[in-house]
């Protein structure tokens, strides 16, 4: 959330941010409400001052025996009290409206962020891991076909049980997912992260605190009730990312200067309704309704957030470096940055099994596995997370940052395609072998049920 003072003093910067991020918000109404609210607060102060003066004279007038003047003062005091009540009621209504309207304003991008309208104008900063990439089969089988051939991914049964956009990982596929999660957690523990295992349901108030609500209500899974129905602060939703509960751990709290920086990591399943709206990405596990992820959340002093941002990026990249997966780093332009971010980098892993329009020149496609974001004080204001620089100083809002460390299904896609062998097996990355009881190769398993038989082998 932007502060009232910032919006009041820098309306053109806010207007530029609305244009840069393509956000539709009524800034003129916000400024109008803020001005009227301040006028009413000033009028309220005047009325309280006048009423106190009048009230203080009532006793003196009665003591002096001037009953008519005393009665007139009493009536004047009551009139001032009534007017003050009306002014305060109107001011309260305006303040509530102003708070709602401020939630519709996005974070102002950093001045050095690339300016652009869409992902086409994101800036590739560098590539890693391509100089010594492994030899691939002449024709790489896409993960969704290979996963079914090896019987480690089951899309049909996932859809049968839960609907489209859900899947089963099985056998070595399930072990590989578990291995990835444990490997990622170990990597980030080495980087100084403390583990948090968060609750899966989160309140609407928590979703507002991190900026998912009110803008992205339609993408969330509501626990009871329709998404388009009104909701209260306490209504529960399935978490779309562990960023929500971990950031809101400290909502409405004041941390001490000695506490900072706080670095938490959290594994969780994540739930999003948006899957299935992106063409060819609906095949396989690139874009699904439920997926596993390790999230990194940082709470820092304002003066440290720029440096910590680059440190967080390196910490997320470490996972891909140790898996020996080629990837690239993009800096997001203003139009593709997101509602809450001041600055954002994406890490995209190379998956060679499916060619994409505008994809890498060597074929295949890029898959986003992490977004590393600096929110500055935007989330901290929404969730009212503060810190006290010194014990006797005023508290101020800290800065929050987060990044995925990283999304599991898309890394699984990259492994199945990049570590694929000519014989249709998959080599287990060396870094994951200790997490799979030393297994070095995924060869698949025997399929179960009549559906695994050819038509000629089935009984009538």
Swiss-Prot record:
InterPro entries recorded: aa-tRNA-synt_IIb, aa-tRNA-synth_II, aa-tRNA-synth_II/BPL/LPL, Ser-tRNA-ligase_type_1, Ser-tRNA-synth_1_N, SerRS_1_N_sf, SerRS_core, tRNA-bd_arm
Enzyme class: ligase
PROSITE patterns in the record: AA_TRNA_LIGASE_II
GO biological process: selenocysteine biosynthetic process; seryl-tRNA aminoacylation
Disulfide bonds: none
Region (Disordered): 50-71, 109-129
EC assignment: 6.1.1.11
Binding residues for L-serine: 241-243, 295, 404
Keywords annotated in UniProt: Aminoacyl-tRNA synthetase, ATP-binding, Cytoplasm, Ligase, Nucleotide-binding, Protein biosynthesis
Keyword Cytoplasm: yes
GO cellular component terms given for this protein: cytoplasm
Record: residues binding ATP: 272-274, 288, 368-371
Substrates-to-products reaction catalysed: tRNA(Ser) + L-serine + ATP = L-seryl-tRNA(Ser) + AMP + diphosphate + H(+); tRNA(Sec) + L-serine + ATP = L-seryl-tRNA(Sec) + AMP + diphosphate + H(+)
Acidic residues bias: start-end ranges: 109-121
Record bears the keyword Transmembrane: no
Biased composition (Basic and acidic residues): 50-65
UniProt-annotated location(s): Cytoplasm
Annotated GO MF terms: ATP binding; serine-tRNA ligase activity
Pathway assigned to this chain's UniProt record: Aminoacyl-tRNA biosynthesis; selenocysteinyl-tRNA(Sec) biosynthesis; L-seryl-tRNA(Sec) from L-serine and tRNA(Sec): step 1/1
Family designation: Belongs to the class-II aminoacyl-tRNA synthetase family. Type-1 seryl-tRNA synthetase subfamily.
Primary role: Catalyzes the attachment of serine to tRNA(Ser). Is also able to aminoacylate tRNA(Sec) with serine, to form the misacylated tRNA L-seryl-tRNA(Sec), which will be further converted into selenocysteinyl-tRNA(Sec).
Domain topic, free-text comment: Consists of two distinct domains, a catalytic core and a N-terminal extension that is involved in tRNA binding.
Subunit structure: Homodimer. The tRNA molecule binds across the dimer.
Protein name: Serine--tRNA ligase
Gene source species: Halobacterium salinarum (strain ATCC 700922 / JCM 11081 / NRC-1) (Halobacterium halobium)
Organism placement in taxonomy: Archaea, Methanobacteriati, Methanobacteriota, Stenosarchaea group, Halobacteria
């Amino acid at each position: 959330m932007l502060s009232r003072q910032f919006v009041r003093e820098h309306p053109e910067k806010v207007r530029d941010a609305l244009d840069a991020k393509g956000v539709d918000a009524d800034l003129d109404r916000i400024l109008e409400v803020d001005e009227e609210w301040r006028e009413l607060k000033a009028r309220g102060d005047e009325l309280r001052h006048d009423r106190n003066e009048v009230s203080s004279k009532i006793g003196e007038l009665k003591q002096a025996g001037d009953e008519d003047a005393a009665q007139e003062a009493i009536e004047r005091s009551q009139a001032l009290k009534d007017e003050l009540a009306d002014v305060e009621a109107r001011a309260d209504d305006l303040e509530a409206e102003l708070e709602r309207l401020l939630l519709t304003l996005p974070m102002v991008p950093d001045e050095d962020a690339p300016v652009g309208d869409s992902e086409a104008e994101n800036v590739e900063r560098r590539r890693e891991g391509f100089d010594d990439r492994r030899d691939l089969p002449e024709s790489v089988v896409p993960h969704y076909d290979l996963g079914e051939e090896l019987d480690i991914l089951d899309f049909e049964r996932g859809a049968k049980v839960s609907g489209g956009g859900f899947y089963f990982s099985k056998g070595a596929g399930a072990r590989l997912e578990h291995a990835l999660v444990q490997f990622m957690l170990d990597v980030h523990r080495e980087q100084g992260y403390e583990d948090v295992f968060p609750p899966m349901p989160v309140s609407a108030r928590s979703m507002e605190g991190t900026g998912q609500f009110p803008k992205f209500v339609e993408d969330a899974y509501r626990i009871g009730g329709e998404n388009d129905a009104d909701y209260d602060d306490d209504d529960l939703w399935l978490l779309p990312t562990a960023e929500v509960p971990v950031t809101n751990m400290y909502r409405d709290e004041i941390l001490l200067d000695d506490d900072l920086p706080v670095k938490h990591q959290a594994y969780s399943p994540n739930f999003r309704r948006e899957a299935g709206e992106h063409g060819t990405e609906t095949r396989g596990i690139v874009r699904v309704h439920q997926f596993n992820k390790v999230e990194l959340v940082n709470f820092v002093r304002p003066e440290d957030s720029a440096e910590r941002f680059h440190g967080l990026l390196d910490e997320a990249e470490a996972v891909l470096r140790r898996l020996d997966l080629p990837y690239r780093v993009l800096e997001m332009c203003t139009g593709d940055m997101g509602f809450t971010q001041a600055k954002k980098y994406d890490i995209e892993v190379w998956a060679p099994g499916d060619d994409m329009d505008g994809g890498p020149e060597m074929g295949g496609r890029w898959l986003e596995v992490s977004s590393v974001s600096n929110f500055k004080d935007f989330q901290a204001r929404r969730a009212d997370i503060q810190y006290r620089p010194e014990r006797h100083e005023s508290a101020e809002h800290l800065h929050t940052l987060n990044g995925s460390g990283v999304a599991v299904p898309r890394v699984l896609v990259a492994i199945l395609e990049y570590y694929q062998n000519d014989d249709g097996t998959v080599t287990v990355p060396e870094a994951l072998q200790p997490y799979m009881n030393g297994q070095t190769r995924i060869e698949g398993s025997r399929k179960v049920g009549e559906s695994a038989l050819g038509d000629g082998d089935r009984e009538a």
